[in-house]
Structures are given as C-alpha cells and as structure tokens.
C-alpha cells in the first residue's frame, strides 16, 4: 500500500485499452500515403495466400486460413469458417474481427456469402452466420 504522499508525488496510471482487432482501426490515405485512425466493423481485402494450419494442443485438425492484404495495406491472417470454401489467391473477401482460440496469430474471420466468398452448401441451421440462402420448401 502506498502512502498518500507517494500517491501525491506519482499518481496511479490508468490502463490503456488495447484493441482485439487493430487492423480494423486503421485507414489509408492514398493521396498522402499515410495511415489514418478510422474504426470500421469490417474491411475488404485480397487473399494473398490460402492454406491450412494445425491448432494448438490439445486440439487436432487442419484449419483453413487465408492471408489477406486489406484495403489499408495491412496484411493479416484470417480464418475461413464452415465446411468447404471457394477461396483462392486474388479472391476479394470481407473481414470481421474475432479471434480463433486454438490458432495463434489469427484475429480475424472471413465473412461467408459476401464479395467473392460463397456461402456454405447444404446448411440448414445457423445459416446467417455462414451466408447460406433459405432452402426452397
């Protein structure tokens, strides 16, 4: 416990809150070629690499991911949710925040059913999360 005098001389510092998805908080001014502070819920980007990676222990799988260059020129790793996908290099995708707990360094999700990303086929439940249209009755 500090004394009152110690707190008067050097007050407590408030914690600086850090963003969970920092690439969504940056914009790019192409005229000045500078980064700007713009908060966005999603960002558009182009896939530079699509592949699979293995999760941390104790899980075992081949998780699909894409390396994406965003419209603000930041390159990030994003998870491709759902079973099967149609993404390849140069596909234009929409990114949202949200990490994948068992993949280190993956802090973003690709939005299914937006831009070049197709929705998941034959999905009956939680369709809106996977960009699947309502099946014909």
From Swiss-Prot:
Family named by the database record: Belongs to the universal ribosomal protein uS12 family.
Region feature Disordered, mapped onto this chain: 1-55
InterPro entries: NA-bd_OB-fold, Ribosomal_uS12, Ribosomal_uS12_bac
HAMAP family documented for this protein: Ribosomal_uS12_B (MF_00403_B)
Keywords: Methylation, Ribonucleoprotein, Ribosomal protein, RNA-binding, rRNA-binding, tRNA-binding
Ranges annotated as spanning the membrane: none
Protein name per Swiss-Prot or TrEMBL: Small ribosomal subunit protein uS12
GO cellular component: small ribosomal subunit
Annotated positions of the 3-methylthioaspartic acid modification: 102
Function: With S4 and S5 plays an important role in translational accuracy.
Record organism: Enterococcus faecalis (strain ATCC 700802 / V583)
Quaternary assembly: Part of the 30S ribosomal subunit. Contacts proteins S8 and S17. May interact with IF1 in the 30S initiation complex.
Annotated GO biological process: translation
Compositionally biased intervals (Polar residues): 27-42
Gene behind this protein: rpsL
Domain of life the protein comes from: Bacteria
Gene Ontology MF terms in the entry: rRNA binding; structural constituent of ribosome; tRNA binding
Keyword presence, GTP-binding: no
